[in-house]
């Protein structure tokens, strides 16, 4: 049983933390359980947070893995260098293949890279809630078909339809 999630502010995204908190496993059996944290600069303590949430549900994590991806936090990282992004994506594909190999072989252990000490990651992750804002986001109104699909499917209810157009809320 696997849990794959991105790292946000060196921790778990709110939607993942909420999912793990609400998770009910009547009979998880004794299957191989793994986590994969995808990250840009650091895994922070996201893997530990996921393991703790699962342990609280009585589920032991056998393997903690990580895959470095293109960092998409645009206030700090320039995504216009297409070649640099392509190289990072190619490297990520190799890391994904290695993770798949470990999972298929049921090889346990913690191979998460680029962790940050708990206290530092905790302080930074505590700012996540105040930074999760959409006020600076915009949608291309001329490209919106008004179908409402984005608003219906947004897992955070961060998009609404107003006057037949989608808007961030």
List PLM regions with ranges.
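FMN-binding flavodoxin-like domain, especially the glycine-rich phosphate-binding loop
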Residues: 1-5, 9-131
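Generic structural signal for residues positioned in beta-strands
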Residues: 63, 138-139
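Short loop/turn microsegments at loop-to-beta-strand junctions
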Residues: 134-135
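Iron-sulfur cluster-binding cysteine motifs and their immediate structural context
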Residues: 139-140, 145-169
């Amino acid at each position: 049983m696997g849990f794959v999630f991105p790292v946000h502010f060196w921790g778990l995204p709110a939607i993942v933390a909420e999912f793990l908190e609400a998770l009910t496993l009547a009979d998880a059996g004794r299957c191989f359980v793994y986590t994969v944290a995808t990250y840009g600069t650091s895994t922070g303590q996201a893997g530990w947070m996921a393991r703790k949430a699962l342990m609280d549900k009585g589920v032991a994590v056998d393997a903690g893995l990580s895959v470095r991806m293109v960092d998409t936090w645009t206030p700090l990282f320039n995504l216009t260098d297409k070649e640099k992004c392509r190289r990072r994506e190619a490297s990520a594909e190799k890391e994904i293949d290695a993770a798949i190999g470990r999972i298929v072989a049921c090889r346990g252990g913690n191979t998460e890279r680029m962790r940050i000490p708990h206290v530092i990651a905790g302080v930074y992750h505590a700012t996540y809630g105040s930074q999760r804002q959409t006020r600076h986001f915009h949608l291309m109104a001329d490209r919106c078909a008004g179908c409402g699909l984005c608003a219906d499917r947004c897992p955070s209810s961060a998009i609404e339809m107003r006057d037949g157009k989608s808007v961030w809320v």
